[in-house]
């Protein structure tokens, strides 16, 4: 449509709200343009008027115009028609609601049946949800039999009435008629009058839609509202179809089959049926046909109208085409994955995209993508023509559409578009400013690259284009892991962003280097892989030497090489360089100590024999071989450290250069793996054969043992299970032993081993399978089962349990498998394939549900996490407000220390004579001893650390785990400070411990997750809640800071000087602020992906716990499904029962508890039951029992009359083992019989120590039944027997089928002296759950006992407990196979499921029952039902969520769309206009020849010039930030969140440019601050330009650009605001023309002769100046006086840090003029 209206610059209004409702018959008629009366579509080859393709409804012919709007086929959107139905019919979507309404109102007078005084009705009126309200009103009216009578005047409720009067049936003005029972059958509504005496009224009749319509029409509006139906939008009578709208032909297009015939759409067929049925009904009515024929015709019309809307009605035949294919109704068009909502609105096919196969190219940078030239010729980017690029655009247009780089279209300002393929006239290619040129994409353009399935955020990333020959996308190898791509034929998609805003977002948020560290598990997702990883290990070995020619070639592959060749490690006999030396050139300035994967822990730390300890100091690799642990995507790897210390750009360079250098070296060295690498020597092979044969013999012995019943069963397992487990143990051990002996035989230079140790491919299991033995094949976790007459294959004998016949493969892959081994191996492999296929679909659906449940959860600007309704999910993201990317594992040192250790580490024992020796300045010692205040401070500090420790142990981390992911790696910061300030660990520090304590206190107080304004809220509770949230957020980190920077440790362990310590404090603060999560971040989607992605890697099956207990545990995907579906019935319900401390350590006592809990019936302990006819109770016929029967009757029970006993005897023999195991006695069991049957049974039992345990039970006849016939006694006894066995509970808790005991020796406890130890406890696991009853057992520790049944926990313990249980269960499922997901993602899922106070399942029954908008709900599941409900109950959608906005094609309020940008119009008035250069001599840094760093990342726009440090209301778009300046691009510490910038890339404040720089001339005609890619370092900036010269007279520091009146350096400029630390209007020596002038530094002056460029302090012209230099210039683009954050890797300082001297902007730690002692102002924090 857009093509047919002239373009307007006016912004489109956003849709604020969507109101749903039902069209009334009048509305349908009014909007209709034609009444459809004929089923035919054509007449004489033309569309028939009044037919289904009436020309008024829109044309379907290219040559015709529409009769209604005169538009052509392309322009006319179509217009509705209508069909007048002869009789009203039910609408299938509304019929259930109509039925409910009929049950609420009187059949005769349409009054609401219930009375307004009724309590239940009043409660119903309070329900906000209209649908629920209707259901509640239906419940109120359910039991009404009569429409109550009464005068209208009594409607007003008289409050003076008494309760009794009120309770009487109130007369509410009904008609008094009897009400029928109303039911629905298929499409009919049936009324049934139950007790009608009148013969004239039929008891049961069909209620016609006409009659229903009349009833509904009479309903009053207020009654309607009471039922939840809003008469303004959806009256009840509109739910009956009287007029049917006919959709316009464009909705149901027809296709030409051949020249004459047309194929009509399904809807057109259906409408034709409706029209035919309607005509037939009209004809019958006209002819006065009998009622039953009319009813039949109506029913036929009803059927067609119903199947037109929904063709899947249960109980109705489907409407079909002639071919028998069911027609696609309106409902089928909307629902499901391919339907309108999900298929065409939520996800669409898009333009400007490409897809092809990917191949590898290690010479590309990780953020590049090689694009085939053919694709680059086809994809375009609309570039607006400006004076700066007009020449370039003309050149592109000259190249035309078929030559790259060229252009495809020109779009004029009025919107006309010229296709350059067909342009005839030269005048059409004329360009003016403001036109748009659709140019080909070119090197350096940013694109989005994606590989499906997009399981996590890193599946779509921004890349820069590199146009290359041939037809595949080229990709760096390191990027394959986040995409999960390989090069075996994978295809990937590329999308070209079309606006500057989008490009800016891609560059600032999505680029690959920014995604290196993933928030999912706070570790890198990209590392060095494949050849490079293998090469790196070989390259950094001790014996890797290179000659000069190779070194020179390698240096060529190092783009960042500074031109200095490192001195050779070996000079004689010839010069040789080591690999470590060259690798050091790549490593940025970091400090790191790590171990390789093959490190032996027994080695001494200082010296590693196998070179397995990696030491990097200041970027020099001093020792260690680099393998996957150091270079891979691991936590704490080099990549992780570089990313955190130096930012994404340095990290990108490191990965790129490692690949180019190492690959080049590896090509020269060569690497190959042949079959020879897998062949072991004969001695090893003999060893392997021996191992396997001995294992086979062991299995034989086991079989013999089992057959001779000499087998000890393990508790809870049968003989066969125990046997299988033992066999498995033996065989697996054999495989491992054989494998390890094969591995040990491999020499160091074995190529296979090289790959495995480097971590680039393969594992040790692969080696052992290739060389030694493939091992046992399993199906469903067991050995190959018997499938053919008690054997696995016909080739084996029956009942062969030996290794070979049950799937043990003793050959290696090298030797080859025998046929039967091959077959078993294939069985095992097939299972894996099936498993994967099943798993993929399941996890895909889980992920979709998770995303739909959490898609609208985001961080808001008050640091809370909320959904689109504004419900608070969390008060602070992850409870600490930190972004998952910025946390690293750190250990809290004080947690596990005992009291003596704690005192040694943290307490200042001032009075000891040797206090401070060797670590404190004697003057300071004296001061501390004599100053009571200091001593007080230090003692308080120790107490604080102690209280921290007890808080940690008792509340925060009772488990005693000291390693936690926390922001700001403190240990590394200390290391860096020691290196940076040259701290000698043997020297004493000049610090006063009290200063340390005070500084740390101030620092901790400043660490806030949100800069709180004074809360204006008067609400005490509100403020208290916020205070608690903020306190909790930083509590753990504060404890970490306090325990690490305790004054004694700073002085003894770290020996920091005052300067270094203050630097560290500043760094902590700035890094903490950088680690905060950004508002607008969609943490819900992130959490869903972080949980869904590992689920894809999960195993599907339930595994047995290896080991003793046979407790089954559901794990993997099925368990995850149970948790998020909140399954009522868990597959393996189980309790973990902890006992009270005195019981827990005693096995016998634990056994007693076990037997008390286990549910035991008589059947469990019975071995046999028999029924005898034994007529004489005193002398039994069973000889075995004679003894104890006689002894019983010697002392008979008085009450028992022998003669009343039945002659039939039930004799139960008990299983002695079970009875003793359950700790029962015969008396206990008899007691239970008496308890359940009283005196009607007589029970005699043998002694507990008798050989057999016997119960003898007889019936006792009561007085009344005496003497009656006893024939059926034995039958009765049989029934009693079965009842006793199954029902009679001896002891235990119902539901707990079995209890298993196990010990846990990892239970944390605090020892006597305050240390942290572990103790062993007996723990009970149950099969079956009954939490409440178990917890009430006196010996059970109810505080620790848990259940894995989530529904049970909420019933017993409530919502907070359930949240914790959910977290625990999710963590268990995910960590089972070694994955790790950061807590914050699991927490969001748990919070989303519980925040409403009840459990919300992640299914349609949970997600779709929340009060979100109908559009959002219908995009998940139950699409049509939800939309129908929305219409009936006239719901509104506020369009706040993600889905609604996407459906409406709007920018959703997320990420950069969650705020607006204002334009400061006053500043525009002051803006300078710039003289535009003549188009002819503009130079283009964008031409492919010149790869300027600035060009590589973006382009500019001509916004008014302004200062980059403005207030947020500044005249610039949000598109670009200051980080775009060429120097900031590699700015190590740049953080997108905190630095402001402007929409062009170059500013005068860029560190590469400075007024003192001789190479800049402000009057040069080809320089303009808004030049899109101007960079003074750009090689294409022509030095021969006449006005460009270092000595050029036109350069003058007072040029209008830097004059005091210049807006960018004027005293009113915000970058020199009076609050800026370096500005003081009264300072006599301050001059706005010298931005780097520092009044307090006498030795600093740009012209000072003693100032040398190699001086460690700052010089803008110095070649060695770099953003990573120790001093950071205040003119750097990411520095802003208002910005609390600074460069994370900058060794220099952050402006808000206390030691940053405000009067010394060019502070440098090594500057001799710096003295902190005088101008140290800790409180200089910008408000």
From Swiss-Prot:
Entry remark concerning the domains of this protein: The C-terminal domain (CTD) serves as a platform for assembly of factors that regulate transcription initiation, elongation, termination and mRNA processing.
Location of region: Disordered: 1478-1512, 1551-1727
Binding site residues for Zn(2+) 2: 106, 109, 147, 175
Protein name (database record): DNA-directed RNA polymerase II subunit rpb1
EC number: 2.7.7.6
Family annotation (Gene3D superfamilies): 1.10.132.30, 1.10.150.390, 2.40.40.20, 3.30.1360.140, 6.10.250.2940, 6.20.50.80, RNA polymerase ii, RNA polymerase II, clamp domain
Function of the molecule: DNA-dependent RNA polymerase catalyzes the transcription of DNA into RNA using the four ribonucleoside triphosphates as substrates. Largest and catalytic component of RNA polymerase II which synthesizes mRNA precursors and many functional non-coding RNAs. Forms the polymerase active center together with the second largest subunit. Pol II is the central component of the basal RNA polymerase II transcription machinery. It is composed of mobile elements that move relative to each other.
Positions annotated as Sequence repeat: 1553-1559, 1560-1566, 1567-1573, 1574-1580, 1581-1587, 1588-1594, 1595-1601, 1602-1608, 1609-1615, 1616-1622, 1623-1629, 1630-1636, 1637-1643, 1644-1650, 1651-1657, 1658-1664, 1665-1671, 1672-1678, 1679-1685, 1686-1692, 1693-1699, 1700-1706, 1707-1713
GO molecular function: DNA binding; DNA-directed RNA polymerase activity; metal ion binding
Binding positions (Mg(2+) 2): 486, 488
Post-translation changes: The tandem heptapeptide repeats in the C-terminal domain (CTD) can be highly phosphorylated. The phosphorylation activates Pol II. Phosphorylation occurs mainly at residues 'Ser-2' and 'Ser-5' of the heptapeptide repeat. The phosphorylation state is believed to result from the balanced action of site-specific CTD kinases and phosphatase, and a 'CTD code' that specifies the position of Pol II within the transcription cycle has been proposed. Following transcription stress, the elongating form of RNA polymerase II (RNA pol IIo) is polyubiquitinated via 'Lys-63'-linkages on Lys-1266 at DNA damage sites without leading to degradation: ubiquitination promotes RNA pol IIo backtracking to allow access by the transcription-coupled nucleotide excision repair (TC-NER) machinery.
Localization of this protein: Nucleus
Residues that bind Zn(2+) 1: 66, 69, 76, 79
Keywords: DNA-binding, DNA-directed RNA polymerase, Isopeptide bond, Magnesium, Metal-binding, Nucleotidyltransferase, Nucleus, Phosphoprotein, Repeat, Transcription, Transferase, Ubl conjugation, Zinc
GO BP annotations, alphabetical order: transcription by RNA polymerase II
Positions bound to Mg(2+) 1: 486, 488, 490
Region described as C-terminal domain (CTD): 1553-1713
Cited PANTHER family: DNA-DIRECTED RNA POLYMERASE, DNA-DIRECTED RNA POLYMERASE II SUBUNIT RPB1
Bias (Polar residues): 1480-1505
Entry similarity comment: Belongs to the RNA polymerase beta' chain family.
Cross-link (Glycyl lysine isopeptide (Lys-Gly) (interchain with G-Cter in ubiquitin)) at residue(s): 1266
Region of interest called Bridging helix, as start-end residue ranges on this chain: 819-831
Assembly and oligomerization: Component of the RNA polymerase II (Pol II) complex consisting of 12 subunits.
Gene name in the database record: polr2a
Lineage, highest ranks first: Eukaryota, Amoebozoa, Evosea, Eumycetozoa, Dictyostelia
InterPro entries attached to this UniProt entry: DNA-dir_RpoC_beta_prime, RNA_pol_asu, RNA_pol_II_repeat_euk, RNA_pol_N, RNA_pol_Rpb1_1, RNA_pol_Rpb1_3, RNA_pol_Rpb1_3_sf, RNA_pol_Rpb1_4
């Amino acid at each position: 449509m857009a093509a047919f209206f002239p373009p307007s610059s006016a912004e489109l209004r956003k849709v604020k709200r969507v109101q749903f409702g039902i069209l009334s018959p009048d509305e349908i008629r009014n909007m209709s343009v034609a009444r459809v009366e004929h089923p035919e579509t054509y007449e004489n080859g033309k569309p028939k008027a009044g037919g289904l393709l009436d020309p008024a409804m829109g044309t379907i012919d290219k040559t015709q115009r529409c009769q209604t709007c005169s538009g052509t086929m392309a322009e006319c959107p179509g217009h509705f028609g209508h069909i007048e139905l002869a009789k009203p019919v039910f609408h299938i979507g509304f019929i259930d609601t109509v039925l409910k309404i009929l049950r609420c109102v009187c059949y005769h007078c349409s009054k609401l049946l219930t009375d307004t005084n009724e309590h239940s009705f009043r409660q119903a009126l309070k329900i906000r949800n209209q649908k629920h309200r209707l259901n509640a009103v239906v419940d109120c009216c359910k039991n009404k039999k009569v429409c109550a009578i009464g005068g209208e005047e009594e409607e007003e409720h008289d409050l003076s009435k008494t309760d009794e009067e009120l309770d009487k049936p109130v007369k509410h003005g009904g008609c008094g008629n009897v009400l029928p029972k109303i039911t629905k059958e298929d499409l009919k509504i049936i009324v049934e009058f139950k007790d009608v005496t009148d013969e004239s009224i039929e008891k049961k009749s069909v209620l016609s839609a006409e009659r229903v319509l009349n009833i509904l029409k009479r309903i009053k509006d207020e009654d309607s509202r009471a039922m939840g139906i809003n008469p303004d939008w959806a009256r009840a009578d509109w739910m009956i179809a009287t007029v049917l709208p006919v959709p316009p032909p464009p909705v149901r297009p027809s296709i030409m089959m051949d020249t004459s015939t047309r194929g009509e759409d399904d809807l057109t067929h259906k409408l034709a049926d409706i029209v035919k049925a309607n005509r037939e009904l009209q004809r019958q009515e006209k002819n006065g046909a009998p009622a039953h024929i009319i009813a039949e015709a109506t029913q036929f019309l009803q059927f067609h109208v119903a199947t037109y809307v929904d063709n899947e009605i249960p109980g109705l035949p489907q409407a079909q085409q002639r071919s028998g294919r069911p027609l696609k109704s309106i409902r089928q068009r909307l629902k499901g994955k391919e339907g309108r909502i999900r298929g065409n609105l939520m996800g669409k096919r898009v333009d400007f995209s490409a897809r092809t196969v990917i191949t590898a190219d290690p010479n590309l940078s990780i953020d590049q993508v090689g694009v085939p030239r053919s694709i680059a010729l086809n994809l375009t980017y609309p570039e607006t023509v400006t004076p700066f690029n007009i020449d370039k655009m003309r050149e592109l247009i000259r190249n035309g559409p078929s030559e790259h780089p060229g252009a495809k279209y020109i779009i004029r300002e009025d919107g006309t578009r010229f296709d350059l393929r067909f342009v005839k006239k030269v005048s059409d290619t004329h360009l003016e400013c403001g036109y748009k040129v659709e140019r080909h994409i070119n090197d350096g353009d940013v694109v989005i690259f994606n590989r499906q399935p997009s399981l996590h955020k890193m599946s779509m990333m921004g890349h820069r284009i590199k146009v290359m020959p041939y037809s595949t996308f080229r990709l760096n190898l390191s990027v394959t892991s986040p995409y999960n791509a390989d090069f075996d034929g994978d295809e990937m998609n590329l999308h070209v962003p079309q606006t500057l805003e989008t490009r800016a977002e891609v560059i600032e948020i999505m680029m690959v280097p920014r995604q290196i560290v993933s928030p999912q598990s706070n570790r890198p997702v990209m590392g060095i892989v494949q050849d490079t990883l293998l090469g790196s290990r070989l390259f950094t070995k001790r014996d890797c030497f290179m000659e000069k020619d190779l070194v020179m070639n390698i240096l060529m592959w190092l783009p960042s090489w500074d031109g200095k060749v490192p001195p050779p490690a070996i000079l004689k006999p010839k010069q040789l360089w080591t690999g470590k030396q060259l690798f050091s050139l790549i490593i940025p300035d970091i400090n790191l100590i790590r171990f390789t994967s093959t490190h032996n822990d027994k080695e001494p730390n200082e010296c590693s024999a196998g070179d397995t300890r990696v030491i990097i100091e200041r970027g020099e690799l001093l020792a260690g071989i680099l393998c996957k642990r150091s270079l891979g995507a691991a936590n704490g790897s080099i990549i992780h450290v570089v990313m955190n210390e130096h930012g994404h750009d340095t990290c990108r360079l490191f990965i790129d250069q490692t690949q180019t250098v190492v690959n080049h070296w590896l090509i020269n060295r060569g690497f190959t793996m042949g079959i020879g690498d897998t062949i072991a020597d004969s001695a090893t092979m003999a060893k392997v054969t021996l191992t396997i044969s001995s294992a086979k013999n062991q299995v034989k012995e086991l079989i013999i043992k089992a057959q001779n019943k000499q087998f000890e069963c393990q508790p809870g397992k049968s003989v066969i299970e125990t046997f299988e487990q033992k066999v498995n143990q033996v065989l697996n051990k054999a495989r491992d032993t054989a494998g390890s002996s094969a591995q040990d035989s491999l020499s160091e230079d074995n190529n296979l081993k090289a790959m495995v140790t480097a971590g680039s491919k393969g594992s040790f299991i692969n080696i052992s399978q290739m060389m030694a033995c493939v091992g046992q094949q399993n199906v469903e976790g067991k050995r190959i089962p018997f499938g053919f007459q008690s054997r696995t294959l016909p080739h084996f004998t029956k009942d062969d349990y030996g290794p070979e016949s049950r799937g043990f493969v003793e050959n290696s892959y090298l030797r080859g498998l025998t046929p039967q081994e091959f077959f078993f191996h294939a069985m095992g492999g097939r299972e894996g394939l099936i498993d994967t296929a099943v798993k993929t679909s399941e996890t895909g659906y889980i992920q979709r549900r998770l995303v739909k449940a959490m898609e609208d959860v985001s961080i808001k600007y008050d640091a809370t996490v909320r959904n689109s309704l504004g419900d608070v999910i969390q008060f602070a993201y992850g409870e600490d407000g930190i972004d998952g990317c910025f946390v690293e594992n750190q250990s809290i040192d004080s947690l596990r220390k005992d009291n003596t250790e704690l005192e040694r580490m943290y307490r200042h024992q001032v009075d000891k004579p040797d206090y401070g020796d060797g670590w404190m300045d004697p003057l300071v010692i004296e001061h501390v001893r004599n100053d009571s205040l200091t001593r007080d401070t230090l003692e308080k500090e120790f107490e604080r650390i102690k209280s921290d420790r007890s808080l940690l142990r008792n509340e925060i981390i009772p488990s005693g785990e000291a390693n936690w992911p926390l922001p700001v790696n403190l240990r590394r910061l200390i290391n860096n400070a020691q290196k940076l300030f040259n701290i000698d660990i043997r020297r004493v520090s000049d610090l006063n411990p009290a200063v340390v304590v005070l500084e740390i206190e101030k620092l901790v107080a400043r660490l806030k997750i949100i800069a709180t304004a004074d809360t204006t809220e008067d609400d005490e509770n509100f403020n208290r809640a916020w205070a608690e949230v903020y306190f909790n957020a930083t509590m753990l980190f504060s404890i970490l800071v306090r325990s690490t920077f305790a004054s004694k440790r700073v002085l003894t362990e770290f020996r920091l000087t005052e300067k270094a310590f203050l630097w560290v404090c500043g760094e902590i603060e700035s890094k903490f602020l950088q680690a905060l999560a950004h508002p607008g971040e969609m943490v819900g989607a992130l959490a869903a992906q972080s949980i869904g992605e590992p689920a894809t890697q999960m195993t599907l099956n339930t595994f047995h716990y290896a080991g003793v207990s046979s407790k089954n545990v559901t794990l993997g995907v099925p368990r995850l499904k149970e948790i998020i579906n909140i399954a009522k019935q868990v597959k393996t319900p189980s309790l973990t029962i902890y006992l009270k401390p005195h019981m827990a350590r005693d096995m016998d006592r634990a056994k007693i508890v076990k037997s008390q809990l286990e549910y035991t019936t008589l059947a469990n302990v019975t071995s046999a039951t028999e029924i005898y006819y034994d007529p004489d109770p005193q002398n039994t016929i069973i000889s075995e029992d004679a003894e104890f029967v006689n002894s019983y009757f010697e002392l008979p029970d008085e009450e028992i009359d022998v003669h009343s006993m039945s002659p039939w005897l039930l004799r139960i023999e008990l299983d002695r083992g079970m009875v003793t195991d359950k700790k029962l006695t015969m008396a206990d069991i008899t007691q239970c019989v008496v308890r359940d049957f009283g005196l009607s049974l007589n029970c005699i039992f043998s002694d507990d120590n008798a050989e057999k345990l016997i119960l003898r039970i007889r019936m006792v006849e009561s007085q009344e039944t005496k003497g009656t016939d006893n024939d059926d006694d034995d039958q009765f006894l049989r029934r009693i027997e079965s009842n006793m066995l199954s029902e009679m509970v001896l002891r235990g808790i119902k539901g707990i089928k079995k209890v298993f005991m196990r010990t846990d020796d990892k239970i944390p406890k605090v020892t006597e002296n305050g240390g942290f130890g572990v103790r062993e406890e007996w723990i009970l696991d149950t099969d079956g759950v009954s939490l409440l009853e178990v917890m009430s057992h006196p010996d059970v520790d109810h505080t620790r006992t848990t259940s894995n049944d989530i529904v049970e926990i909420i019933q017993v313990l409530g919502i907070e407990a359930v949240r914790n249980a959910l977290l625990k269960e999710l963590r268990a499922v995910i960590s089972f196979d070694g994955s790790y997901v950061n807590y914050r993602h699991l927490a969001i899922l748990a919070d989303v499921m519980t925040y409403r106070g009840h459990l919300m399942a992640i299914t349609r029954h949970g997600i779709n029952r929340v009060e979100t908008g109908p559009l959002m709900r219908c995009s998940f599941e139950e699409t049509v039902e939800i939309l129908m409900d929305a219409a009936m109950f006239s719901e509104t959608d506020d369009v706040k969520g993600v889905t609604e906005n996407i459906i409406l094609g709007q920018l959703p309020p997320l990420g950069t769309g969650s705020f607006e940008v204002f334009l400061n119009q006053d500043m525009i008035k002051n803006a300078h206009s710039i003289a535009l250069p003549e188009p002819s001599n503009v130079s283009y840094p964008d031409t492919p020849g010149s790869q300027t760093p600035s060009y590589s990342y973006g382009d500019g726009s001509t916004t008014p010039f302004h200062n980059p440090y403005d207030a947020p209301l500044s005249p610039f778009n949000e598109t670009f930030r200051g980080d775009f300046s060429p120097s900031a691009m590699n700015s190590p510490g740049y953080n997108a969140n905190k630095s402001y910038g402007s929409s062009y890339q170059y500013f005068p404040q860029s560190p590469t440019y400075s007024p003192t720089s001789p190479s800049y001339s402000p009057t040069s005609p080809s320089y303009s601050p808004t030049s899109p890619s101007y960079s003074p370092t750009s090689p294409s900036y022509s030095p021969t330009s006449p006005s460009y010269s270092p000595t050029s007279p036109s350069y003058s520091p007072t040029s209008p650009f830097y004059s005091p009146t210049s807006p960018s350096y004027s005293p009113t400029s915000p970058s020199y605001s009076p609050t800026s630390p370096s500005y003081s209007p009264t300072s006599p020596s301050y001059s706005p023309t010298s931005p780097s002038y520092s009044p307090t530094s006498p030795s600093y002056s740009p012209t000072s002769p003693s100032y040398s460029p190699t001086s460690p302090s700052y010089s803008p012209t110095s070649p060695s100046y770099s953003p990573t230099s120790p001093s950071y210039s205040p003119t750097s683009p990411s520095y802003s006086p208002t910005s609390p954050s600074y460069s994370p890797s900058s060794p220099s300082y952050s402006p808000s840090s206390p030691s940053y001297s405000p009067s010394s902007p060019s502070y440098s730690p090594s500057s001799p003029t710096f003295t902190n002692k005088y101008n140290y102002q800790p409180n200089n924090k910008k408000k």
